[in-house]
Amino acid sequence: MSAFRTHCREIVDEYVQTVLIIDDGAGLKHKVESAEHIDMEDAENATIFDDLDDLDDLDDLDDLEDLEEQEDSEDQEKVTHPLNTLDLTNAFYDLGIVAGLYQPQIEAEQPVDEFAQKIRKVSSTADIIILDWMLTDHDSSYSKAIVKQILDQDKESGGRLRTIVIYTGETSLHDKRDELFEYLDDQSLDNSDDYRISSEHLNIVFYNKEGSNNQLREVAEHELPNKALEEFTLLVDGLVPSFAMKASAAIRYNTGRIITRFGKELDAAYLSHRVLVPDPEDSELFMLENFVSYMRNILAIGRIDNIALGAKSIQNWVNHNFPHLNKKIVHDGNDYTLELEELIKLSQDGFHQNLYQLLDNKKTIIASAFKDASKEASLKAISIYDTQDSTAQESSRQLSILSAFKRTYLDVTDVNEIPYLTQGTLVYSKSDDKFLLCVTPKCDTVRINKSKRFSFAVLDEVNGKKFDMVVPINNAVRVNKKEICENRQEEIISLIIDDRIINGGKTKDYSLYDDLRELEKEEYDDYIYLATSSKFYTLEHIVFECEENKRVLGFKLSSDLIEFWDQDCNEYIWLGDLHDLNTISRVGKLVTNLNRTGVDELEWLRRQYQ
């Protein structure tokens, strides 16, 4: 195991707290019979054997023991592959993990989905699930339904890391894997690896119980917990996921500390604050901000960022991924491939000065282009982290969205999460083909009486030019923009025809052809690149009517489509809400532009400070 994989495993050991074991061979008794009550006074006065003939009762006792042994034997026959529950749970406990145990009691002809639905809630909190393949009468349908219910639950809740270990005595694990893969019928899943079905956040893996005659996949119960944790570690194979898991583990570990810090002795203070402020609902946000601040403090004190993202972790990551990285710096047809130690140093210390000094010694012909790390050459040099499956550019787009947005349309999973119109809300106007950012102060977007005029800054599409925002777009935006583009093409073609008719079959306005060629180049992928206009006069003001809660609430029309409608029934597609500081920065530029003062001064003097 590499140093980086060991680092990830240590974080997994901190994070994983709960495991659910589902097996019909768990060995739990179906029922317990109460012992007959004995009156001790009567027992003392009684004669153990009133008659020697009572010795015959001993034969009855022997018969009873034989009967119990026979029943136990029959129970073992019903369970083809029993589970050594004690060894398995003790092995998890030794690792500090709570192992829950469930032995299904499946009723005759019980519907599969009804049974699986019962498991759904209890399994939702388990990081790892150990599941037997056949839970009754050589029937795998119940286990497959459980897996599907768990996957559906994870999708509906916004996703989570999950490892499911199919632990069975059945042979032909490849066939079992393919059977489950076909049953799940999910295009996001991959079954190309042996004994495995996986996706970005899911790992379903097949192992055999002891005695199954498959030495390659056989794992004893006391060894299974370590195997399960190794499988879970595969889901955390990255710097950023290990950081997120380390932070989550720290919050889990400090849950008691957090709750005691926010104790009931603060109730009176909170209520006092609520009754004293002009708008009582503001007190709820006040407490939320205090809670978030306290959690951030816990993470900072624990140095979670440094441990998971610092120099040592970077060194381990580069060592682990070096064979798969591009490592090549290219400029003007020349290139240089970085050595391992060089890539580690650049990753730890950055490009500034370091990249220029390196190339000045190793590849002088391209070194000068990297002397100023703020120039485009250095920006393109991040391709050293490209792999066969992904690029640093694509990764940077995703991180820029994460750092700019509180949430986007991709993050809304529940009806209670539907957004309302507020400062920082980004929408797309279907009728005007414009991207608009709400800049109305937050306090003016709540407690609305009937209707309110909202102000929006216009964000210009700047594909191929300088941009300050990357925005994910849904299919509704793509379809609308494509329709507008096609309509515009038809208009230009009509203008070209009219131009030639008017000019006797000759073209006079060649700019129309240029416009048509530009429209034909238009492509609509998963992102739009925008630049915020700082011109105050470009602001748009639109009136929206509020709901009963005195806010302008969006309408969810499909899984990825949420819209606002103004008082004239124009549609605005919600794309996301920016982080507060990101919004304030853009509003600040607007205000600065508004406050510009033009001074007519001596040109010689003006050039001294320009």
Regions picked out by a protein language model, each given a short descriptive name:
Residues 331-403:
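Charged, compositionally biased non-catalytic regions
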